Amino acid sequence: MWINRLVKHPSYSVLRFYTKRLCTVSVKSLREFGVLPNSTICHSVYPRRTYVMGRAVINDILIKKSYSTHTVCAIDRSKDENNGSAYDKFEAKGIPIDVHTLKRIISSSGMDESEFSKSISYLFAKTVDPEPKDVLSLEDLSFLLSKLYTQRFQIRRICRDINAKYSEFWFKLFSLYAEKVDAKRNQVNLRNTKLDACEIFDANLMIKNFIELGQLGKAQKILSFILDRNPDILLSPKNADISTIVHFLQLRCGALAPYWKIPDNSEQKQGFLRKMVRLGAKNTSIRLSSTYKAMDHQTLLKIADLALQEKKLLNSEDLLSTLIQSFGHLGQTQILERCIEHIWQISPQEFPSHVVIKHRGCYPSSKILVSILVSFYFNDHDLHRGLSILDSFIKHYPDVKLDALFWRRLFQLSHFAWTPANDKKATSVVRCWHLMKQWYASKRLRPSVDYETLRQLYDIMKKTGNFPLGIDVLRSFKPGIERTRAENAGKVNNIIIKYQKCIIKELVNRGRFSAVREFIDNYGFDRKMTKDLNIFCANRMFLRSKKMKNKIENKKEREKVRLDSFDDDEDDGMIIGSLW
């Protein structure tokens, strides 16, 4: 069919027709596979690789340039042959970035702009396209940026090894990227020349990376870079970008809950002020900046007004979650309650269970419920109102999925709210533990192992001496612990050993030796650990017997001293009586 059409056209129009046809088919196929959206206005609804790979494919078609790492062979396949994810069909099969190349590029971050640009070109040639290039295009740098982000943990380790600043490397990379963005527009009327969807996504990717590093100042500069060039990106119904709004709420409206200072009642001592802790302080996957404050409260209300009207924004889980946290940080709990009622029809006034309610936004998720819990606790310093609303969500939205982060935050907050003087057995925390077990049992699921959750429950067990709680925790998490140990998770393994030793110590001290043997048999997990626990148990039993022996001997000694003292008093009495 194509041949017949080509024959009918004169030779000078064949190439034009072929190019037009191939572009049309390519774009159509990309849309069918979910790689290219029907409209590229809604920037952040689709992932960055949607725009990067889509733009790269079309660019290859138009200028006849084929990257050695781009595989576009699946464009004209039938739908039946494409059962995998859309990205798999266009995934870049690039060479992994080796350590030597990474060290060279990271070391160059301390050089001037030209030397750093040359190192980036060398890195691109080593990992993406072996064709030498003096200057990388913006598309090349965008593709390389995504590849570097996927290997950011390896890059961070290399930075530690060579004593280089990881954050400075990324900020130098952003400076180079911003320079190319400006050069693309020939530095003409930059404030009125908007960034395209891919450039916005790249900038937001770097903001996300700097937030993870706790480099909020650098993240603010990149956010300003976006806002200066796209001033309507926050409040325009047509051009609003979800990722940019989320980062604006996080950086300027207080929606970074891990930074919030929460009062810890469990560590309060009589006559002293309550200790203030941050929720993310024990999290090793992110770093926290030393300072954090919200700066823009007026724009928050405008964003909320837009979000409650636009369906696209209401369907964004990330946006609603950060919006809730912003209201919580601002202390506007009444506005927060009205927003929850407007979006999900959940009110502090309990609805009858038979009432059918419909949500106007996305279906509630763990991220949203965590934001609600943390926001109310931040203002109330107790969990009463947050748990009441949570109970309504679970009742009216039975399909809500509660992940490990939700339970981690619930145990953290319940632990912080626990006052030992009023509740010596921490019944509020134990109640949350039973709630978690009941939820997983109702869904016929096994709880996933989370280090922070295990640590919180271990602290409660140790402070209250509630070793049955520890045994129950190990019993519930046993399948997940066995799987995690097979993956050689060091932190989880260490906290499990603490559980085991604490429980064995309590059982030995109470003289329940048969229970100790049964515990080791059930929760030894492997031969080496069982051997170590038996040795620890034997040592504890030896110490206990030695302590008991010393206690008996001391008791006998005290009894002997008491009898000798009584005999001396009796002799003195007889002497005094005879003299009298």
Swiss-Prot record:
Transit peptide, residues from-to: 1-40
Domain of life: Eukaryota
InterPro entries, A to Z: ATPase_expression_mit (IPR024319)
Pfam families per the UniProt record, alphabetical: ATP13 (PF12921)
One BP annotation, GO: regulation of translation
Localization (cell): Mitochondrion
Keywords annotated in UniProt: Mitochondrion, RNA-binding, Transit peptide, Translation regulation
Cellular-component GO terms for this entry: mitochondrion
Family indicated by similarity: Belongs to the AEP2 family.
Protein name: ATPase expression protein 2, mitochondrial
